[in-house]
Amino acid sequence: MVHFSLAIPATLTEHSLNFVANFSNQPRPLIVKVHDSFLLETKAKAALTRITTQVEGMEFVDGVPANNVSDWARHWSTVYDWRKVEDELNSKFRHFTTTVQAGDNYTYPVPLHFIHHRSPRHDAIPLLFLHGWPGTFHEVGNIVDLLTNPPNTSLPAFHVVAPDLPGFGFSPAPTHAGLGLREMGQSFNSLMMQLNYSRYVGQGGDIGSHILRLMAADFPVSLVSMLSNLFSVSPNATDLERYAKHETSPDETAQISLLKNPDFSWTKAYWDIEASAPLQVSIGLTDSPVGWMAWQYMGMRMLSPGYDWGVDELITWSMLNYIQGPYGGIRSYKEAKREGVLDGNFPYVAQPVGVVQYFGDAAYYTPLEWTQRQGNISFYSRKAPHVVGGHFPAYINPRALAEDCWAFWGNESRSGSGIFLREALLAPAWFPQGSNVRDQ
């Protein structure tokens, strides 16, 4: 029998996370507070950003244009106010920390930061929201009120739990190898059990969706159903053979062509370098806040067509993964590669699965028939190209994704959500129904 210790290792407490936090073995409230010294250092580094000389006419082909980087550096060092953002994060979200187990294959404690917003509705469904790269808990901010307090009682409501993946945001990066996506999923199931949610549903895209698919196999009773906004399915040998013979359907042709498009090589380049040499690439990105901002922005821009990212907005997204350093989040790709996830090796999801696709994301044209090979697909929706959302629909187009959630889980036979009406789930003892933990 494996014995777990939930004591935080000395290596974590000795290493500066650059923010104030206490990770115990039970959920505790957190007030986000980044160290003054780190903020001063970051502004100084932004001011000292060295701008790369670029080749004319290759803007957004070779990378982010130099003038963008120069403008960001100036704005970050002279205008951007993290303390204002911090106040907004503390007033908008109910933050918690805890420590959980991650199963037999990773016996070290897993400290987590998470958001927990309970609905006032007695019939609300517990929902585990998992972000992707390069996101954080922040992705849930624009949709959480729609989920906890839908506009009318005919729509399903949710108790929303949105953790930072380990190494992202305020969830400390693992200090040992072996915390892959499957182990992350086991830690998130432990979190839901700790919150007294014995059954729950899941929503996620990108890495978050990958984790939910692994969780579905590991926890077939607890995870009742899932809604994915990036249900990745690779074409098999037969698909590629038919494509070469021009025998594929329009959807199949579009998705395979997308994967073969030279522009898509940008996305694959991120996977390859982050999965192969995460520490090497992180050395420079950890030292340069603006360099890190440019690194993540190139992918964000390509995967969210039609959305205009503001400078303050981009800096905040960058800061949330720069505070503790980007290495832990980047290294998750190395673990995903080890598990075969980057090659599309997933277990079949027997639970009901909803699939929604937003234009610009990597799996936009994936045919229904392909998704049915890897899951019990009971809901499938592809948005028209003019509908914004891309890789980040919860953040960019929260109403549209909320409507997907309502449509999927509002249908009991399609999603299995009827079980939540038949079971009386008790509110967690440490977080009474309707209470505001910040007042305790």
Explain the meaning of each model-derived region.
Residues 1-10, 440:
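Fungal secretory targeting signals
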Residues 39-118, 326-342:
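Non-catalytic accessory segments flanking enzyme active sites
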Residues 84, 153, 161, 165-179, ...:
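Glycine-rich "HGGG/HGxG" loop immediately N-terminal to the catalytic nucleophile
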Residues 124-132:
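Short beta-strand element of the alpha/beta-hydrolase
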Residues 133-145:
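The serine-hydrolase catalytic nucleophile loop
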Residues 146-155, 194-255, 414:
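Conserved hydrolase catalytic core segment
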Residues 176-194:
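Alpha/beta-hydrolase active-site loop
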Residues 274-440:
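C-terminal subdomain of alpha/beta-hydrolase-fold enzymes, centered on the catalytic histidine
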